[in-house]
Amino acid sequence: ESQVDSSIGGKTAIDMDGVKNIVGAFHQPRAVLIDPDTLRTLPPRQISAGLAESVKMALTSDADLLDRIERSADLTAGLPEIIARSLTIKKNVVEQDPHEHGLRRVLNFGHTVGHAIESSAGGRLLHGECVALGMLPMCAPALRPRLIRVLRKCGLPTEIETTREALLPYLRHDKKGQGAAVTAVEVDEPGSF
């Protein structure tokens, strides 16, 4: 996950009192080193979790990348390209909105609901798995079947046993909300941001 998302952007945060990423700061690193070869040391579940962030980037900002992921015969062999394209998207967004006042909010696609799932799951699910699940209710109904196919291809979950009531307390404490309002990003079609 960190190779395609949190490694750049300068946003740091910690969980507190069961709420995901509630305390944080913005500070740009001097350098970021990314080596896709290190991914060979990870179990497949971790690779899948990282791919969720690339699917997020593709859905919001690069329809061609989504096609590439969807058509790929071997996602593992395609990881260097998928990582590079995901990082380019993130870099472009962060450069335009370094402090998350506008466009950068698109990077939160899947994260509002995903963080609620992650907090309520109590560590049973990886961050990327929760982001994958969080994207599903936030995309247009016509896009959802395609997203389900892509997530399954990436080895990610597409269903979870929970209730809206179980997630609401976590949604209300999401750092992106203002007052009682919950702020979430919706995607109508791939690459629309």
Predicted regions and their residues:
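A glycine/threonine-rich phosphate-anchoring loop and its flanking beta-alpha core
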Residues: E1-R71
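Glycine-rich, charged/polar anion/phosphate-binding loops
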Residues: G18, E118-S119, Y170-L171
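Generic structural signal for secondary-structure transition and capping sites
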Residues: A31, A63, D74, K91, ...
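C-terminal charged capping/lid subdomain of soluble metabolic enzymes
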Residues: Q46, A52-S54, L143-F193
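Active-site segments that bind and position negatively charged phosphate/pyrophosphate groups
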Residues: R68-A166
